[in-house]
Design a protein with these regions (language model features):
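Rhodanese-like catalytic fold shared by cysteine-dependent sulfurtransferases
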Residues: 1-21, 28-60, 70-107
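Short, surface-exposed ligand- or partner-binding patches at beta-edge/loop junctions that are enriched
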Residues: 64-65
């Protein structure tokens, strides 16, 4: 499974020469109310098995959760379903807040 650090993702998102990946946030709705990375799409982990057909298998997808554990599980699931361009955000939104956006609310 590929991983990307929050700092690497921020750099990638700021590069207009690169196509933006889908930011798939698999946290629960109550977590999204606290904080989220701008532009992310919500799909709680428990709904992924029923909804993964909504995702583009050919689009690079960065999967996000609180610390990186749930997103790693979703990455592995998506890879088993034939998705080859999934990347886990190492450290999740907690890492994003620590490395990229210190103003982001944490929990």
């Amino acid at each position: 499974m590929r991983q990307i650090s929050p700092a690497q993702l921020a750099q990638r998102l700021s590069d207009p020469q690169q196509p933006a990946p889908l930011l798939l946030d698999v946290r629960e709705p109550w977590e999204l109310e606290i904080c989220r990375i701008e532009g992310s799409v919500a799909m709680p982990m428990g709904s992924v098995p029923a909804r993964f057909s909504e995702l583009d298998r050919n689009r690079e997808t960065v999967v996000i959760c609180h610390h990186g554990g749930r997103s790693a599980q979703v990455c592995m699931f998506l890879e088993r379903q034939g998705f080859s361009r999934v990347i886990n955000l190492a450290g999740g939104v907690a890492g994003w807040a620590a490395q990229v956006d210190p103003r982001m609310a944490q929990y």
